[in-house]
Amino acid sequence: AYWSFDDKKLIFQSNNNNWGVECDQMFIMDFDDTFDKSQPKMVSTGNGRTTCSYFLPDNEHFIYASTHLKDDNCPEAPLRKEGKYVWPIYDSFDIFISDLEGNITGQLTNEKGYDAEATISPHGDKIVFTSTRNGDLDLYTMNIDGSNVKQITFDLGYDGGAFFSPDGSKLIFRSSRPKTEKEIKENKGLLDQGLVQPTNMELYICDSDGKNLRQLTDLGNANWSPVFHPSGKKILFSSNFEAERGFPFNLYMIDLDGKNLTRV
């Protein structure tokens, strides 16, 4: 779930059968809604699968990724491949702008491959997203209208879940970067099948144009969902690096120089 810029609403995805959906769709709520006697308002098309919604600064529109242009039906969501936990990377995902009534007002991507995981700069002028348009899962930026697309990460592996710093000058993201010949072969083999294995990810930080890229964590296991603290001086993230069997995940805070790791 993500806050609106005025902190009054939340937008999130759900496949709650009690709300009449079986495939992830986007819903909006006031921050204090409880849904004891009601259900949240669906603001996506109700077709295909959706992911990664984020409010625009006007609080009247949002972006999200959806597969509905390719197929109204819900695409398969495999959880394991040869015993390994995997995420599907649907090449039918594109990024759209919608109003709060669920009306799509613009399509921002139309390239072959996966386009998703989009978030917006605090200034409301730039979008960062993950795409496979070059054959790998890299980060790109574009203007709020979909123009001026630029690739900003280039190393082999999965770069995703990027967020801007409060001043818009930096990005924090999760990355799974294979290094050995075996890891590279497995990574490419999974991606050829539209899959990625998210069990070994570290956090990386860079300028918003991709410069000054550096690895922030080296903890092992899955370190993900990083966001900047409002001060811009720390990163809050989720990790299972202390877990013996993959669970539980806990929240941690770390300085931008990788020091002072603290479990929250």
Give residue ranges: language-model regions:
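A structural motif specific to WD40 beta-propellers
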Residues: 38-41, 105-106, 149-150, 213-214, ...
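Hydrophobic beta-strand positions that form the internal "hydrophobic ladder"
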Residues: 10, 62, 127-128, 171, ...
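Residue-level detector of Asp-centered blade-edge/turn motifs that repeat once per structural unit
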Residues: 5-6, 57-58, 122-123, 166-167, ...
